[in-house]
Amino acid sequence: MSKQLIYSGKAKDIYTTEDENLIISTYKDQATAFNGVKKEQIAGKGVLNNQISSFIFEKLNAAGVATHFVEKLSDTEQLNKKVKIIPLEVVLRNYTAGSFSKRFGVDEGIALETPIVEFYYKNDDLDDPFINDEHVKFLQIAGDQQIAYLKEETRRINELLKVWFAEIGLKLIDFKLEFGFDKDGKIILADEFSPDNCRLWDADGNHMDKDVFRRGLGELTDVYEIVWEKLQELK
């Protein structure tokens, strides 16, 4: 399968394929935090992220969620549908943590009565600012119906993920999703789902996600390996 690099991101490289509607995503060993301010090469991270994300996307596909995932090609590669990414990070919070706790001056780990969905404008130059529905419409990123769909689909995905992670003894604190338009103009889930873009805590409150790297709490791949081993219990 011939391929040409079309985009190089913090965690993945994206390549063309012979089919204009398909791309290859190659997961890197690079770990970043604080919008790339903290950066490190960590051997084995790309393999683990690809394994975890491929597994989660396969389960989401099987549950009827429309995603860009087609198949896992190798240890670090997966085949995806090509999408036009919507420049929004859609964050869902089940518990207080991270920037939410800092913004509102509350402790981490407080259960939210209703999960909160937030939008962040994908723009590195602006440091991905927190925006509301009206900003989304002003920036002509999405209209009312599309905004409602993004929120509804994110909540639906959350209900699936919460159950799966609870079954393996992990609490889904929060996560970030990205969506895009497929060749038919349909909004589908894109990017990845791994400990890079979610927070997972075990029963003792230990961080099982990229906060280990952000906060210098231990070896990132050790934690990701535990998550991967636990996920395989769902098979």
Curated annotation (Swiss-Prot):
Signal peptide limits: none
SUPFAM superfamilies, A to Z: SAICAR synthase-like
Enzyme Commission number(s): 6.3.2.6
Record GO terms (molecular function): ATP binding; phosphoribosylaminoimidazolesuccinocarboxamide synthase activity
Pfam assignment, any one: SAICAR_synt
Pathway(s) where this gene product acts: Purine metabolism; IMP biosynthesis via de novo pathway; 5-amino-1-(5-phospho-D-ribosyl)imidazole-4-carboxamide from 5-amino-1-(5-phospho-D-ribosyl)imidazole-4-carboxylate: step 1/2
Xref: InterPro entries: SAICAR_synt/ADE2_N (IPR028923), SAICAR_synt_PurC (IPR033934), SAICAR_synth (IPR001636), SAICAR_synthetase (IPR050089), SAICAR_synthetase_CS (IPR018236)
Keyword terms, alphabetized: ATP-binding, Ligase, Nucleotide-binding, Purine biosynthesis
Reaction(s) the record says it catalyses: 5-amino-1-(5-phospho-D-ribosyl)imidazole-4-carboxylate + L-aspartate + ATP = (2S)-2-[5-amino-1-(5-phospho-beta-D-ribosyl)imidazole-4-carboxamido]succinate + ADP + phosphate + 2 H(+)
Top-level taxonomic group: Bacteria
Keyword Kinase: no
Entry's Gene Ontology BP terms: 'de novo' IMP biosynthetic process; cobalamin biosynthetic process
Similarity comment text for this entry: Belongs to the SAICAR synthetase family.
Protein name, UniProt field: Phosphoribosylaminoimidazole-succinocarboxamide synthase
UniProt organism field: Streptococcus pneumoniae (strain 70585)
